[in-house]
Amino acid sequence: MKDFLKKELYSLRAVTAILARWLLLAVPTGLVCGAVGTAFHLAVEHVTEWRGEHVWLLWLLPLAGLAIVALYKLTGCEGMGTNNVIRAVHSGESVSPLLVPAIFLGTVLTHLCGGSAGREGAALQMGGSIGYNIAKLFRFSDHDRRTATACGMAAFFSALFGTPLAATLFGIMVEDVGLAFSVAFVPGFAAALIAYGVSLACGIAPTHFGLTAPALSIDTALLAAVLGAACALVSRGFCWLLHTMEHEMPRRLPNPWVRAVVGGAAVVALSYLMGVGRYNGAGMGVITAAIEQGQALPWDFLCKMLLTALTLSAGFKGGEVVPSFYIGATFGCVFGPLLGLPAGFSAAVGLISVFCGATNTLIPSILLAYELFGGAGLELIALGCGVCYMLSGTHGFYSSQLFVTEKLLSEYTASWEERLRHH
């Protein structure tokens, strides 16, 4: 009995020390990500308002592209993106601290001059870089820096959207599809809550949509499933277009300076052809109108797809997540009523489903629905989201994601089995 108590006491001390170490990491990560995330949110918000008041700024997009190319060359961050941060979680690959100012300024310039991009891709890169480098500063091991990278991603996502639980699960599940990097949950959630608290203290309201949902029934469940299946096609199409253009643009225009100017000019021309302002920037106003007012144009999702793919493939910065919200919400708003579902509710199903299909993150997407919509229609949204997840295949934004299990089969993938053998 005495030996048993000694072992238990030793074990308790050990796990307490480990927990304290993770909290030591979570506090500065949450504070720094909260502060930088708040500054980033305010910067993007202000330049978006300024661009709306000064439409002529759109004509400066090619010049902004040149500035971004110069900025990335100056900081040595050429070619770095969200995939690098995900690889850091997989293997402990280093993440440059200069990625933070590079993606911060690059995204602000993109939004100032009307590029069609989001914020969350930038948030994942900045958060991952901050978490990794704080762990490096504290002399954490290479393996523990992987956890720190995931914590930073969760904290920055939380600061921007005000969804700490979804942000945490996203940060620990986006790397390996079908597996949760569970050791990062407690420090990641602590960092996310701290970052969320910092953003609230600075006056940043969490993202929330008012949503009226139909009653749960066999009919509405079937319709939500059909809508989810349609969203899987949209998700596949968006990811295919992104990857195709990101491959073709550098092949056809290998000079990054020329690519930025030509791509920027093309975005300007298409913006005037499609409607200045509607497809530029993140488009949160259009998303809100689709969900809360049931208003969207039939071609909105296609126009946003094209402009976002063109913007990002030309070298502008931001991300794909908020554009996926836009595409899903506007598609759902238009397609859902054809099935007999309310337009606003269909927009909510579309937003979550396309996001889920494009990021391959089922559980975080369902939690995001809860935090964005306050639980309204959660069962139906989760059903549509689940169907979209299963039918979206291995298509996704992030080529560095590893698929631990097949989406439609109860077995590990060959790539995961190979990875286990290497360890």
Show which residues each predicted segment covers:
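Alpha-helical transmembrane segments and immediately membrane-proximal extracytoplasmic
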Residues: 1-423
